[in-house]
Amino acid sequence: GNEEYIKILKKNFPKNFNLEGLKIVIDCANGAGYKAGPKLLESLGAKVFAIGIKPNGLNINKNCGSTFPNKIKSAVKKYNAHIGISLDGDADRVIMCDERGSIIDGDQIIAALAIRWKNKKMLRGGIIGTLMSNYGLEKFFKLNQIKFIRANVGDRYVKEKMQKNNFNLGGEQS
């Protein structure tokens, strides 16, 4: 079950990718990612501090997860972590914060991944954003010669455009 899923998830990372030396807090929102999230990060070598990992069927997203970012911000400071990752209950959204507990905007996450993947020759085609993506993000991609296409708002539409254009990176701010 879970071990097989971790192996599948790890295939999305470059060979020999690791998080050794990083302290990461992950808030799993008492939801779907409560086992796989921490295990994936640990399997990549990170020192993991997991919160929101006690689902009881009623407490999903309750005062935790990506809809309650203050929890991850304070946990990052408490554990002196390098980064905080906060999932929503079904683990399809993420909010991140830096080592100071400052929230990292979704467009910033996409931009950082795009540049990193471009430099490592991992980016395929370009980026899919949405109609709500910041215009500054579009300008940033143009400046860095990365193709940028907007989709309607919603992960379904982002995924459709990614598949249609054979792109391997896309997302929206939420």
Stretches found by the model and what they are:
Residues 51, 89-95, 138-142, 169-174:
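Short acidic (Asp/Glu) and glycine-rich catalytic loops that position anionic groups and cofactors
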Residues 79-81, 166-167:
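Short, high-confidence coil segments that cap the C-terminus of an alpha-helix
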Residues 1-77:
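Gly/Ser/Thr-enriched, mixed-charge loops and adjacent short helices
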Residues 30, 89-93, 101, 133:
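Short, glycine/acidic-enriched loop or turn micro-motifs at the edges of active sites
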Residues 69, 80, 85:
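Gly/His-enriched, cation/cofactor- and phosphate-binding structural elements
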Residues 1-7, 11, 99-171:
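Proline/glycine-rich low-complexity loops and linkers
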